[in-house]
Amino acid sequence: KSLIYTLYEEGRKKDPQVYDVKEPDDRQPGWRTRSYLAKYDLASGILQPLTFGYHNVYLNDISADSRYLLIGKSEERLTKRPTTLNSLYRLDLNDMSVEALVEKGEFLNSAQFSPDGKSILVTGSPEAFDGIGKNVEEGQIPSMVDTQLYLMNLADKKVRPMTKNFNPNVQSVDWSKADGNIYFTAEDKDCMHLFQLN
């Protein structure tokens, strides 16, 4: 048995004699600090780093059988919108192999495993996955804060928009292991509603 930790590594200190700004957000305190994942083995007491590098890495979900981690990585791209890109990876804790699910995805937010571990549910704007969730007139740009649901089959990586024709803005979502249904809250004007998706 083990625990998965999110840990933080402090970035290189700024030289007070040099005005060094990597990007605009570097002016914010703590911007150079990076997050990474580690596994703590309860039997041996050994803490094993799972990720490292320049970009922030975070845990999205753990599969129901505790074999896989759904890992996210964020990085900046300031030359065009969106300025933040998110990648998704599936890490097999049995052999430590990593499978890339999405590389430098645009307009993505979060992701979670299905109860059977064969799919992932991803949240993002209508422009995610090359705009398959867009439901506006040609030439119009959909709102970046209009959160949609997408279902990715892990066998073939095909993605299906689940809420393309659903008007309310998805807020929080959970895929129930009890009944296999997806439950989510969504914002409709000034009201918040709870929905079930099967």
Q: Across the structure, where does each feature detected by a protein language model lie?
A:
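A broadly tuned preference for mixed-charge, low-complexity surface segments
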Residues: 1, 44-47, 95-118, 159, ...
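Hydrophobic beta-strand positions that form the internal "hydrophobic ladder"
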Residues: 3, 69, 117-120, 182-183
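A flexible loop/linker signature enriched in serine peptidases of the S9 family
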Residues: 6-36, 51-57, 72-88, 100-109, ...
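Hydrophobic, helix-prone linear segments
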Residues: 37-41, 88-92, 113
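Short loop/turn segments that connect beta-strands within beta-propeller blades
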Residues: 41-45, 92-96, 153-157, 197-198
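Residue-level detector of Asp-centered blade-edge/turn motifs that repeat once per structural unit
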Residues: 64-65, 115-116, 177-178
